[in-house]
Regions:
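Intrinsically disordered, Lys/Arg-rich N-terminal extensions and targeting peptides
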Residues: 1-35
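Arg/Lys-rich, often Gly-containing low-complexity segments of ribosomal proteins
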Residues: 8, 13-18, 47, 73-89, ...
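Flexible glycine-/small-residue-rich
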Residues: 36, 56-58, 65, 123-127
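Short acidic, Gly/Pro-enriched loop/turn segments at secondary-structure junctions
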Residues: 45-51
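A structural signal for short hydrophobic beta-strand segments in well-ordered beta-sheet cores
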Residues: 52-56, 112
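Helix-adjacent hinge/juxtasegments
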Residues: 55-96
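Beta-rich strand-turn-strand
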Residues: 87-130
Length: 131
């Protein structure tokens, strides 16, 4: 029978489709610039990164397409798919920029997880699988 794998306690969301569609090479751990309502929603497990990707522009990395459902009792209009800045150091950004300039290379988010009460995003350099 099909048994669901248990997520570890610190894993919030996982992008299994990235492992299926891409061959992942180098992995990086990036912080996320979030608003308060987003952190509260993530604590309730309302985050999805299956359609997300990483956009590199102006020497910055952005997480695009990550869907975080707003809380039901929120009193203002919140955008669940807004662009969120990834926090990386200069050496990591330079390595990612250099690698993605090569033909066929891209950068995809693989999972969201907690680390010392902070939300982190694991991103990986990837090459599309042939076939």
């Amino acid at each position: 029978m099909n048994k669901k794998k248990k997520k570890s306690e610190n894993t919030i969301a996982e992008n299994r489709r990235a492992r299926f569609n891409f061959e992942l090479t180098n992995k990086f751990e990036a912080g996320l610039s979030l608003e308060g309502w987003e952190v509260r929603s993530i604590r309730l497990g309302k985050a999805q990164i299956t359609e997300a990707y990483v956009l590199l522009k102006d020497k910055e990395a952005w997480l695009i397409g990550c869907h975080i459902n707003p809380l039901a009792n929120s009193n203002k209009e919140n955008d669940p798919t807004r662009s969120r800045k990834l926090l990386l150091n200069k050496k990591e950004l330079a390595e990612i920029f250099k690698s993605t300039q090569q033909k066929g290379q891209t950068c995809v988010p693989t999972k969201l997880f907690w680390k010392n009460n902070l939300v982190k995003c694991e991103i990986a350099l990837a090459t599309g699988k042939q076939g």
